[in-house]
Curated annotation (Swiss-Prot):
Its EC number is 4.2.1.11. The gene is eno. It comes from Acidovorax ebreus (strain TPSY) (Diaphorobacter sp. (strain TPSY)). GO terms for molecular function: magnesium ion binding; phosphopyruvate hydratase activity. This is Enolase. Keywords: Cytoplasm, Glycolysis, Lyase, Magnesium, Metal-binding, Secreted.
Length: 428
C-alpha cells in the first residue's frame, strides 16, 4: 500500500505572473509527487470553479491562499492514510468532500493539484514513468502537436478576433521531426513578421501577435512561413484555428472587429469559415461557435463536420454530462481536454474515453496561464489521445511539454508511434 502521509499546498506563480496552486504529496515510503495547476484566460461558463481570494490588496484579487488552506486542512484530513495507487477512489473522496456540482467550495484548483500530485507520487512509487503509470502498456502513441504561432483574441493585444492560428505537422515521420518542423516554421515566421516592420513580441502562449489587416492576412503570413521553411502547406503542415467564438458573440451575432466590425449570423459565420477551409488547408476549428449557440454549432457541424475537425472547448469544458448531450445531438466531432476545467484526473480520463467511444477525437490542452508542470504531456501519451495543444515554440512553460514528449518518445524507442494525419480519424 502506498499510503499518503503528508500533503502540502502552496501558492506559486504561473506564466502570467498570477498565483496558482502547487501541491506536494508524500508517501509512507518517502516518495514525493509534486504538481502545479494551470489557469485560463478565455474560459467556458460551465468550467469547474477556480477558487481565488478576491482580496484586491493582494495580487489584484487573484491570490489562491484559500485554495491552499483547503489543501492543508480539509483535504489533508480526508486523504491522509489513503492508498495513492487508488486514483479513482481518491478523486471521488475529493469530489464528495467538496459537495458541489462545480467544485466551488474547495476549488477545482485545489482539488486538481492534489489529484495530479497523488498520481505523480504513485507513479514514482511504482517505478514507472507517469505516462506508463497512467496508460499501462498501451501508451505508445505520441500526439500530433497543434502549434499556436499567431495569437489573437484574449491572448494578444491586436485586432484579431480569432484567438489562435496553428500549424499542425501532419506529414512528419516522428514527434521529434514534428517539433523540428514547427520550430523552423516559427523562426521563418518571425523573420517574415520582422521584415514587414511588425512586432515580433509573443503572446501568452508563445505565438506572435502582429497587427495585421484581417484574419486571412494572418493565415497568409503562416503559409509564407511554411514555404520559406521548405515545407508544403496541406501535405506536410496543415492549419488549425481556435476561434474562441464566445468572446465575440454579442446579442446573437458574431461581431468581427478584425473584419471592420462585421456582424454575422451563425449561418453567415459558418459560410465564412467554410470559405476559409476551401481556400486554405485548415483541418481543425476549435470553438467555431459560441458555447451557448447550439443551433449555430448544429449548422457548423452539418456544413463542415465530415471534412474538418470541430473541437468543443468552451462548449464541452471537459465535462462528460455536456459531452454526452453534444454526442446525442451530433454537435461538433472533437473535444478539447483541459484538466483544470473539470478538476480531477479521473473525470478527465472519463471524458477522453467517452469521446473515443463516440468516434470523437480528444485533444489534450494547456491553458494560457501555465507552469513548468508537464503532466499533460504524459496524459497525452498515456491515453493515446493522438493530439496536443501546448502553445508555440517559445516560452519555457510551453517548451516544457514538448521536451517531456521528446523524452517519452526516446524512452519508448522503436515502439513509439506518431500518427500524423491518422490522428484525425473521424474525417473523410
Amino acid at each position: 500500500m502506498s499510503a499518503i502521509v503528508d500533503i502540502v499546498g502552496r501558492e506559486v506563480l504561473d506564466s502570467r505572473g498570477n498565483p496558482t496552486v502547487e501541491c506536494d504529496v508524500l508517501l509512507e515510503s518517502g516518495v514525493m509527487g509534486r504538481a502545479a495547476v494551470p489557469s485560463g484566460a478565455s474560459t467556458g461558463s460551465r468550467e469547474a470553479i477556480e477558487l481565488r481570494d478576491g482580496d484586491k490588496a493582494r495580487y489584484l484579487g487573484k491570490g489562491v491562499l484559500k485554495a491552499v488552506e483547503h489543501i492543508n486542512t480539509e483535504i489533508s484530513e480526508a486523504v491522509l492514510g489513503l492508498d495513492a495507487s487508488e486514483q479513482a477512489f481518491l478523486d471521488k473522496t475529493l469530489i464528495d468532500l467538496d459537495g458541489t456540482d462545480n467544485k466551488s467550495r474547495l476549488g477545482a484548483n485545489a482539488m486538481l493539484a492534489v489529484s495530479m500530485a497523488v498520481a505523480r507520487a504513485a507513479a514514482e512509487e511504482s517505478g514507472l514513468p507517469l505516462y506508463r503509470y497512467l496508460g499501462g502498456m498501451g501508451g505508445m502513441q505520441l500526439p500530433v502537436p497543434m502549434m499556436n504561432v499567431i495569437n489573437g483574441g484574449a491572448h494578444a493585444n491586436n485586432s484579431l478576433d480569432l484567438q489562435e492560428f496553428m500549424i499542425i505537422p501532419v506529414g512528419a515521420p516522428s514527434f521529434r521531426e514534428a517539433v523540428r518542423w514547427g520550430a523552423e516554421v516559427f523562426h521563418a515566421l518571425k523573420k517574415i513578421i520582422h521584415d514587414k516592420g511588425m512586432s515580433t513580441a509573443v503572446g501568452d502562449e508563445g505565438g506572435f501577435a502582429p497587427s495585421v489587416e484581417n484574419h486571412e492576412a494572418a493565415i497568409q503570413l503562416i503559409l509564407q512561413a511554411i514555404e520559406a521553411a521548405g515545407y508544403t502547406a496541406g501535405e506536410q503542415i496543415a492549419l488549425g484555428l481556435d476561434c474562441a467564438a464566445s468572446e465575440f458573440y454579442k446579442d446573437g451575432q458574431y461581431v468581427l472587429e478584425g473584419e471592420g466590425g462585421l456582424r454575422l449570423t451563425a449561418q453567415q459565420w459558418t459560410d465564412m469559415l467554410a470559405t476559409w477551409c476551401d481556400k486554405y488547408p485548415i483541418i481543425s476549428i476549435e470553438d467555431g461557435m459560441a458555447e451557448g449557440d447550439w443551433d449555430g454549432w448544429k449548422t457548423l457541424t452539418e456544413r463542415l463536420g465530415q471534412n474538418v475537425q470541430l473541437v468543443g472547448d468552451d462548449l464541452f469544458v471537459t465535462n462528460t454530462k455536456i459531452l454526452k448531450e453534444g454526442i446525442d445531438k451530433r454537435i461538433a466531432n472533437s473535444i478539447l481536454i483541459k484538466i483544470n476545467q473539470i478538476g480531477t484526473l479521473t473525470e478527465t480520463f472519463a471524458a477522453i474515453e467517452m469521446a473515443k467511444r463516440a468516434g470523437y477525437t480528444a485533444v489534450i490542452s494547456h491553458r494560457s496561464g501555465e507552469t513548468e508542470d508537464s503532466t499533460i504531456a504524459d496524459i497525452a501519451v498515456g491515453t493515446n489521445a493522438g493530439q496536443i495543444k501546448t502553445g508555440s515554440l517559445s516560452r519555457s512553460d510551453r517548451i516544457a511539454k514538448y521536451n517531456q514528449l521528446l523524452r517519452i518518445e526516446e524512452d519508448l524507442g522503436d515502439i513509439a508511434f506518431y500518427p500524423g494525419r491518422a490522428a484525425f480519424y473521424n474525417l473523410r
